[in-house]
Design a protein with these regions (language model features):
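N-terminal cap/lid segment of alpha/beta-hydrolase-fold proteins
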Residues: 2-39, 43, 400-406, 419-420, ...
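Short beta-strand/loop motif that positions the catalytic acidic residue
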Residues: 264, 270-272
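Accessory cap/linker subdomain of secreted extracellular hydrolases
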Residues: 53-57, 61-79, 83-90, 95, ...
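Short glycine-enriched nucleophile-adjacent loop
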Residues: 152-163, 418
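Glycine/threonine-rich phosphate-binding loop and adjacent beta-strand/alpha-helix elements that clamp
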Residues: 77, 314-316, 326-580
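Alpha/beta-hydrolase fold nucleophile elbow
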Residues: 137-150
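Conserved alpha/beta-hydrolase
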Residues: 90, 94-110
Length: 580
């Protein structure tokens, strides 16, 4: 099929499987939605591996149920027939004069080729798709890219390539550092790709064909018209989960999947989620800070990974942004604050506040020292030399502030400095920033994936403690991950550990706590047991660190010791925001 099938449905002109030829001859397929009749429309484009024909409701039942409960307005003013995972609804955008282009990425859905997610080839393809969309008869020549997660992450990469028709980027919950945020947290292998790739990507690889799902709209297979043997599919699918397991240190493989942010020039909106512990949160902040764009905005919200992308709040924000840059309309965006934060309180309360920068200029960086006597957390450093040990497969050590006498806002990046020794030649350190209510119970928050997440998480493999002095900040250490420095059993080493950006207003009577442990955080050992959930949710969702080859029990299932001396007092550096 060399041309698209065109039809008018639900007051939209739809071109199914429009061909987009790449420079190597591979033809990618896109579904195009635009207003009926002649005209030149601004374009909202996406490129990704989730199959443009797979309905959100069928492919992601648990997430759809959570979305429509949290944001019931999603069901209004739309038949929802064209809903696709992590992309905008055509029935809500085309009536506003936008054209939507959904491209199946190379090797996925209806596009043939080798499936190699986040590769340099994908960025080149996305560049070509932007240029194709910007030169069609129905296009006004201005192309914006929009989408959550995968559809956000690849925007950093193509933005750095500067396609001429690229006019705006909306990077909604999109990681920006392939090694540090997706594959290896603090050098520790994250198991996410092992569950994500077969479930969400390989299941719709081009050539799955009749073995896979069918479009609820067209009745056609969402993973291509041909059905290939599984052996053939394997030949055309990169070993995405296996590469990070084999590559313990940062190398060219990871570098090729991480953008040169200084090259990005297009206006961009980076939308982060306070609850994105384990994948995207850090990337939205770091990418925004590093991007070369003169016109860039940061927005931060809460709730699930998808709620506010589809809610009236998020849709309005996106349309104001794209209306300004793609249509040239006066949407009020010229008055949009460069930083817009939804400040988080317990019980899922958020209060919007406008700011000028990140981290906030008025931050009082405050050291909260870990105290071995009673395992307290406070402003006074301990003076006596001592040590506390913990079993790495146990609950670890928890240090708590006294109940607060007045509210305390923590908004920004967090870091800890510890002196740790191990019985072996290495140690994996898991940090959990927690909120404890007056009854002594953990206060958790709806996270992007898991409905019960803590205030913040941080990780570091002790052998990866080498810092880059040029990139490190007291509040955000930057580890090179290019060398392994083994420990000498029993000998303490200094560790600077990053806890990803967070926000919480701690009410009077509550406590802040820091837990140091040797394995993933769990709320109480139970599963949240969401209907149709694709994985257990015990506090960190799919972002587990349990690979026995990466975390050899002979090394990591042991005993660690936290050391205290007068001149080496471990502390937590908190971004305290003064009242008023």
């Amino acid at each position: 099929m060399d041309s698209a099938k065109n039809e008018i449905r639900d007051n939209m002109q739809i071109d199914w499987d429009a061909p987009i030829r790449m420079d190597d001859g591979v033809v990618l397929r896109a579904d195009v939605y635009h207003p009926v009749g002649k005209g030149k429309f601004p374009v909202i484009l996406s490129y990704g591996p989730y199959a443009k024909g797979l309905s959100f409701q069928e492919g992601y039942k648990s997430q759809w149920a959570r979305l429509t409960k949290a944001a019931p307005e999603v069901l209004q003013n739309s038949s929802n027939s064209y809903q696709n995972w992590e992309l905008v609804d055509p029935e809500k955008w085309v009536p506003d004069g936008f054209a939507l282009v959904r491209v199946d990425s190379r090797g996925a859905g209806c596009s043939p080729g080798t499936l190699d997610v986040w590769s340099a080839r994908e960025a080149q393809d996305l560049y070509a798709c932007v240029e194709w969309a910007g030169t069609q008869a129905w296009s006004n020549g201005k192309v914006g890219i929009n989408g959550i997660s995968y559809y956000a992450m690849n925007q950093w990469n193509v933005g750095a390539l500067k396609p001429p028709h690229l006019a705006a980027l909306c990077i909604w919950e999109g990681s920006s550092d392939y090694y540090r945020e997706l594959c290896r947290h603090g050098g520790i292998l994250c198991d996410f790709l092992n569950s994500w790739h077969p479930r969400q990507v390989a299941s719709v690889q081009h050539g799955v064909g009749s073995r896979g799902a069918k479009s609820l709209v067209t009745g056609e297979p969402v993973a291509g018209p041909e059905t290939l043997p599984k052996e053939e599919l394997a030949k055309h699918c990169a070993d995405t989960p296996g590469e990070p397991k084999r590559r313990r240190l940062h190398d060219d493989y990871y570098a090729a999947r991480t953008a040169d942010f200084a090259q990005i020039e297009a206006p961009l909106l980076s939308a982060a989620n306070w609850g994105g512990v384990g994948l995207h949160t850090r990337g939205n902040f770091e990418g925004w800070l590093a991007a070369g764009s003169q016109q860039k905005w940061l927005e931060v919200h809460g709730d699930t990974h998808f709620t506010h992308f589809y809610s009236n709040y998020g849709e309005t924000l996106q349309k104001r942004f794209f209306g300004h840059f793609l249509k040239g309309e006066d949407t009020g965006w010229s008055k949009q604050p460069r930083v817009s934060l939804n400040i988080r309180h317990p019980n899922e309360k958020f209060v919007r506040r406008d700011e000028n920068e990140w981290p906030l200029a008025r931050t009082k960086w405050t050291k909260y020292f870990l105290r071995p006597d009673g395992q307290g957390l406070g402003l006074d450093a301990p003076t006596a030399a001592t040590a506390l040990s913990y079993e790495t497969m146990g609950d670890g050590l928890t240090f708590r502030t006294p109940p607060l006498t007045k509210s305390l806002e923590i908004t920004g990046p967090v870091a800890a400095k510890l002196w740790v020794s191990s019985e072996t030649t290495d140690a994996d350190i898991f940090l959990v920033l927690r909120l404890i209510d007056p009854a002594g119970k953990d206060v958790t928050f709806i996270g992007s994936n898991d409905p019960r997440t803590p205030v913040g998480l941080g990780w570091l493999r002790a052998s990866h403690r080498k810092l880059d002095p040029a990139l490190s900040r007291p509040y955000r250490p930057w580890h090179t991950h290019d060398k392994e420095w083994p420990l000498k059993p029993g000998e303490p080493v200094e560790l600077d550990i990053e806890i990803w950006p967070t926000c919480i207003v701690v009410p009077p009577g509550y406590r802040l706590a820091l837990t140091i442990r040797g394995k993933d955080y769990e709320v109480d050992g139970t599963d949240a047991a969401l209907s149709n959930a694709p994985y257990p949710m015990k506090g960190v969702g799919p972002f587990l660190h349990i690979d026995p080859d990466d975390r050899d029990p002979k090394i990591f299932a042991s005993r660690n010791t936290l050391h205290f001396t007068a001149d080496k007092a471990p502390y937590l550096l908190l971004p305290v925001i003064p009242e008023g």
